[in-house]
Amino acid sequence: LDPVTKAPADCNTKEDVRAQIDRIDQGLLTLLAERHAYVTRMAEIKTDPHEAYDPTRIEAIIAKQRKRAEELDLDEDQAELIWRTLINWNVNYEKGIIAARKRHG
């Protein structure tokens, strides 16, 4: 069963808090899977593995996420670390898909 959504202030036990964190984690994984589907589609559209790495686009994404993190009162450096990890994962995945397609024609 999905736990009932509670505001942080309404969580009175560690179990309450953990249930909410687990609920959010499931949502994050669902969003990552959705994002990954778009990354896969991008890899299908791109024709050269070098296209997977676009430093200008990456830095624009990082700047946008740092700003959003600040607006949400989150640590911008930690947000950047998370996004760089996500971007590196996606870039490497795209490169692999594109390179495999080029090899197999």
Can you annotate each of these PLM segments?
Residues L1-G105:
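Domain-level signature for soluble enzymes in the chorismate/prephenate branch of the shikimate pathway
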